[in-house]
Regions:
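Short catalytic/ligand-binding loop motif for oxyanion handling, primarily in non-cytosolic enzymes
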Residues: 16-17, 46-49, 71-75, 122-124, ...
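Metal-dependent phosphoester-hydrolase catalytic domains
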Residues: 141-149, 157-250
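Structural motif corresponding to alpha-helix initiation and N-cap regions
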Residues: 20-24, 50, 96, 161, ...
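Alpha-helical scaffold elements lining the catalytic groove of polysaccharide deacetylases
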Residues: 125-141
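Active-site beta-strand/loop signature of hydrolases that rely on acidic residues for catalysis
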Residues: 6-12, 26-49, 78, 102, ...
Length: 250
């Protein structure tokens, strides 16, 4: 038996880059998207950003957090009711980075281990990201058994960088590439213009939904990718998101 699963990921860029102006764009896109499970990066917990995003539409979500570098900031996984997350775990990846994983049983009986992360950002430090990817793989190899693993996030790595090569060698496939034939050319920067915006690095594909095990992508596309009406310099975040429709158990 197979289960359908709709997943998404977005680096929400904390509270920087015209946050008060772009927050309504995040909420509007989330209201339309309503995935089953979503990974968020750069969440500021005291601002309740993850819970606010989860409450933007008709669906209700549980937010599961994993701090990175300091206790008020990090990654979050939103799990849509009535799905339940079990076996929650966090790993520290050093350089103020971490990952979170949860085990989810789907209505048809299939199980998914869903993980979210945000790797080191300095463009030249490919070896750091490669080491972080290796630790992620070891951690996921030791995770509770599941039919499939879904690993999402901002990897700060192009598809040909060692971290991504290592993930593919470990059996992970990019959902976007599986559905479309190749990864998107760019997921950062989005096109936002803001004081103090991050300009370190060339535009490229840095964000992914990785799949391993009995799962395949039937559709994948960019999300949170539309500028504000009347302002082409304002986007939901400095990153574009990705969403994917999956079949788990085959």
């Amino acid at each position: 038996m197979t289960d359908a699963l709709h997943v998404a990921t977005l680096n929400i860029r904390n509270i920087a880059d015209r946050y008060e102006e772009r927050l309504p764009l995040i909420l509007a896109d989330m209201r339309a998207l309503q995935p089953d499970v979503m990974g968020l990066q750069e969440v500021v917990y005291p601002m309740q950003e993850d819970r606010l995003i989860g409450a933007s539409g008709e669906a209700r979500y549980r937010a599961i957090r994993a701090w990175a570098g300091r206790p008020e900031y990090g990654n979050s996984v939103l799990v849509r009711e009535p799905l339940e997350a079990m076996a929650e775990d966090r790993i520290d990846l050093d350089r103020n980075r971490s990952a979170i994983r949860v085990l989810i049983r789907l209505p048809g009986g299939a199980t998914v281990l869903f993980a979210a992360t945000h790797l080191h950002h300095v463009p030249a430090d490919e070896s750091v990201r490669d080491e972080q990817a290796g630790r992620l793989i070891d951690w996921l190899d030791a995770a509770p058994a599941a039919d499939a693993q879904v690993l999402v996030g901002d990897f700060n790595a192009e598809p040909d960088e060692p971290a991504c090569v290592r993930l593919r060698a470990a059996g992970f496939r990019s959902a976007y590439a599986e559905a479309n034939g190749a990864d998107p050319p760019v997921t950062w920067p989005s096109g936002i213009q803001a004081p103090g915006m991050d300009t370190d690095g060339d535009p490229g594909c840095l964000d992914y939904i990785w799949l391993r095990g009995k799962v395949r992508a039937t559709d994948a596309r960019l999300a949170f990718d539309r500028p504000a009406v009347g302002d082409p310099t304002l986007y939901p975040s400095d990153h574009l998101g990705i969403e994917a429709h999956l079949l788990v158990g085959e």
